[in-house]
């Protein structure tokens, strides 16, 4: 089965690579329209997936990731339209010039070819990834979580209908609908057809891909994100940022998981934090330095376990740790962070600059929420993933991250001397 999918994807990629920006946008507009026109079939499939997931005991965080509503589906369609409005990087001349020999040389952006994406129970990823791949002239093979098999099948069927109506092969966007995990191992060895693999899931999936894949892998999406509250932070303003970073949508990878509080502000900050977190329904996992004081407040508090500093809660849970100073905060982030998104809240711009320079994450913020690490917020449109590695792409992966380049030399029967 996968062999045939690979062949179809490779053949489709050749045709996609030749499309103009106008032709690609026409396809995307058709997909957006069809997602809305056929929303009932997608929502019905999703309702079945959610019911099965609930019966199987999936957590509230996972159910939130899985669920589609009419508003969310409309938002997904609107995201596709936003991709239409983005500049097409394919064909862009990055740099170039004329050599002494007279050869005119340029470095031009081109599609990668075929992209494989393995992802968790988030049905919006199916459309986000497909739209970005099509915009950049790439074919894609999708392997979503078993919890979303019906939703993904219905969504990809709609996308393939749109492709066919525009005269393009259905092989441009395909989904593996068999939940057999053995197929993942087979997918990892399809370097004959797939040019880049993006796993979006837990540490176990990332480890499997790094160890078994014969395809170049871009890893990311695990977000143990931190906010450091410096001693000069404005408490009222800091709390607004923390509430946003923790509670706006707790199931996302850019949600803050650990709050590091400077010891010199702790006495005034912790009572205010407890009140705010109680109102937001957040459970605090406090270290020894913060536990006693937080236990006198209204928020639910438990003693933090050492291993929880490495946890991506994806829920209304927040670690709270007292640190001595900026150095202590940076050391903690280096030990427990995942190089995703980290922030400092401070009025001391020297500390802010040190934090920016010394915290080695894909996104670092000063006086802002970690929730901004998102392709749409960055003006990149929908994202394929948030890369936490350093080669090829880092941070939210928009259109440029789905391209490579080729060198083109144009001469007049020019020979090398």
Curated annotation (Swiss-Prot):
Domain of life: Bacteria
GO BP terms in the entry: L-proline biosynthetic process
InterPro entries: Ald_DH/histidinol_DH (IPR016161), Ald_DH_C (IPR016163), Ald_DH_N (IPR016162), Aldehyde_DH_dom (IPR015590), G-glutamylP_reductase_CS (IPR020593), Glu-5-SA_DH (IPR012134), GPR_dom (IPR000965)
Keyword annotations: Amino-acid biosynthesis, Cytoplasm, NADP, Oxidoreductase, Proline biosynthesis
CDD domains: ALDH_F18-19_ProA-GPR
Any single GO CC term annotated in Swiss-Prot or TrEMBL for this entry: cytoplasm
Cellular compartment(s): Cytoplasm
Single GO MF annotation: NADP binding
A Pfam cross-reference name: Aldedh
Pathway it works in: Amino-acid biosynthesis; L-proline biosynthesis; L-glutamate 5-semialdehyde from L-glutamate: step 2/2
Enzyme class: oxidoreductase
The protein's Enzyme Commission number: 1.2.1.41
Catalytic activity: L-glutamate 5-semialdehyde + phosphate + NADP(+) = L-glutamyl 5-phosphate + NADPH + H(+)
Principal localisation: cytoplasm
PANTHER family, A to Z: DELTA-1-PYRROLINE-5-CARBOXYLATE SYNTHASE, GLUTAMATE SEMIALDEHYDE DEHYDROGENASE
Similarity-based family: Belongs to the gamma-glutamyl phosphate reductase family.
Function summary: Catalyzes the NADPH-dependent reduction of L-glutamate 5-phosphate into L-glutamate 5-semialdehyde and phosphate. The product spontaneously undergoes cyclization to form 1-pyrroline-5-carboxylate.
Official protein name in the record: Gamma-glutamyl phosphate reductase
Species the sequence originates in: Escherichia fergusonii (strain ATCC 35469 / DSM 13698 / CCUG 18766 / IAM 14443 / JCM 21226 / LMG 7866 / NBRC 102419 / NCTC 12128 / CDC 0568-73)
């Amino acid at each position: 089965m996968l062999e045939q999918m690979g062949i179809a994807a490779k053949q489709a990629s050749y045709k996609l690579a030749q499309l103009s920006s106008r032709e690609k946008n026409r396809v995307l507009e058709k997909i957006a329209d069809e997602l809305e026109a056929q929303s009932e079939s997608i929502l019905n499939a999703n309702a079945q997936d959610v019911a099965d997931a609930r019966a199987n005991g999936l957590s509230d965080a996972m159910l939130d990731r899985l669920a589609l509503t009419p508003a969310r589906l409309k938002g997904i369609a609107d995201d596709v339209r936003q991709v239409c409005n983005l500049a097409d990087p394919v064909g862009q001349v990055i740099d170039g010039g004329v050599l002494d020999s007279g050869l005119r040389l340029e470095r031009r952006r081109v599609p990668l070819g075929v992209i494989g994406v393995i992802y968790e129970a988030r049905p919006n990823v199916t459309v986000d990834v497909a739209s970005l791949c099509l915009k950049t002239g790439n074919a894609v093979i999708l392997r979503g979580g078993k919890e979303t098999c019906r939703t993904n099948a219905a969504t990809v069927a709609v996308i393939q209908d749109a492709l066919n109506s525009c005269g393009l092969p259905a092989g441009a966007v395909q989904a593996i609908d068999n939940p057999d995990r053995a197929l993942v191992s087979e997918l990892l060895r399809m370097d004959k057809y797939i040019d880049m693999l993006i796993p979006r899931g837990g540490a176990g999936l990332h480890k499997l891909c790094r160890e078994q894949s014969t395809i170049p892998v871009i890893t990311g999406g695990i977000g143990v994100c931190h906010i450091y509250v410096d001693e000069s932070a404005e408490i009222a303003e800091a709390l607004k940022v923390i509430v946003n970073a923790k509670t706006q949508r707790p199931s996302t990878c850019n949600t803050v998981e650990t709050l590091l509080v400077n010891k010199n502000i702790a006495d005034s900050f912790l009572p205010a934090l407890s009140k705010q977190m109680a109102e937001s329904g957040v459970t605090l996992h406090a270290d020894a330095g913060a536990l006693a004081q937080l236990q006198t407040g209204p928020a639910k508090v438990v003693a933090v376990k050492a291993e929880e500093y490495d946890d991506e809660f994806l829920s209304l849970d927040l670690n709270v740790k007292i640190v001595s100073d900026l150095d202590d905060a940076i050391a903690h982030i280096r030990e427990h962070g995942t190089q995703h998104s980290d922030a400092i809240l401070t009025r001391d711009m020297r500390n802010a600059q040190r934090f920016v320079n010394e915290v080695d994450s894909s996104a670092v913020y000063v006086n802002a929420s970690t929730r901004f690490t998102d392709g749409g917020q960055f003006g990149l449109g929908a994202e394929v993933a948030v890369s936490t590695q350093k080669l090829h792409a880092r941070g939210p992966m928009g259109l440029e991250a789905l391209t490579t380049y080729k060198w083109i030399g144009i001469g007049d029967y020019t020979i090398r001397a």
